[in-house]
Amino acid sequence: MQLTSFTDYGLRALIYMASLPEGRMTSISEVTEVYGVSRNHMVKIINQLSRMGYVTAVRGKNGGIRLGKPAGQIRVGDVVRDLEPLSLVNCSSEFCHITPACRLKQALAEAAQSFLKELDNYTLADLVEKNQPLYKLLLVE
C-alpha cells in the first residue's frame, strides 16, 4: 500500500512540528523548504490538518503553525485515516463484471484495517522523541 503524496507530506509536516522545541512555531515556508515541496501543495495540506485539529495556525506578526495537540496524543493511524482515501480497488459493476461475486474487496478492506490498527500503535511522539539523527536531518537540534 502506498500513501498519497498528500498524506505523506501531511505526516512529514507533523513530524517536523513535533520535532521542534516545545512551544516553537514554524511556518509553511519553513516546512516546504525542509522537504522541498510546493508551497501551494503544503498550504492545502496544512489547511486540512488545521481543520482536523492536528495543527493550530496563529495569525499575526508572531504567528505561524504548530501542533494542535501534544505529539503523544496524535496517533499515526488517525492521521492516515483522516487524510488517506483507503479504497484500494474500484469495485463497481461498471468497471468489473465479477463484482457481485468477488470477495477481494472484503479481503483488501480487512488488510487496510490491519494496517491502520498497526499504525495506531505509534504517536508522533514515538517517531520523534530522542531521535537525534532526525533532528540533525531536519536541522532542529
Curated annotation (Swiss-Prot):
Binding-site residues, [2Fe-2S] cluster: 91, 96, 102
UniProt KW keywords: 2Fe-2S, DNA-binding, Iron, Iron-sulfur, Metal-binding, Repressor, Transcription, Transcription regulation
PROSITE patterns cross-referenced by the UniProt entry: HTH_RRF2_1, HTH_RRF2_2
GO biological process: negative regulation of DNA-templated transcription
Database matches in InterPro entries: TR_Rrf2-type_CS (IPR030489), Tscrpt_reg_Rrf2 (IPR000944), Tscrpt_rep_HTH_NsrR (IPR023761), WH-like_DNA-bd_sf (IPR036388), WH_DNA-bd_sf (IPR036390)
Pfam families: Rrf2 (PF02082)
Cofactor descriptive note: Binds 1 [2Fe-2S] cluster per subunit.
GO molecular function term, any single one: 2 iron, 2 sulfur cluster binding
Domain of life: Bacteria
One GO cellular component, as annotated: cytosol
UniProt-listed NCBIfam families: PRK11014.1 (NF008240), rrf2_super (TIGR00738)
Function recorded in the entry: Nitric oxide-sensitive repressor of genes involved in protecting the cell against nitrosative stress. May require iron for activity.
Protein name per the record: HTH-type transcriptional repressor NsrR
Species: Klebsiella pneumoniae subsp. pneumoniae (strain ATCC 700721 / MGH 78578)
Designated gene of the protein: nsrR
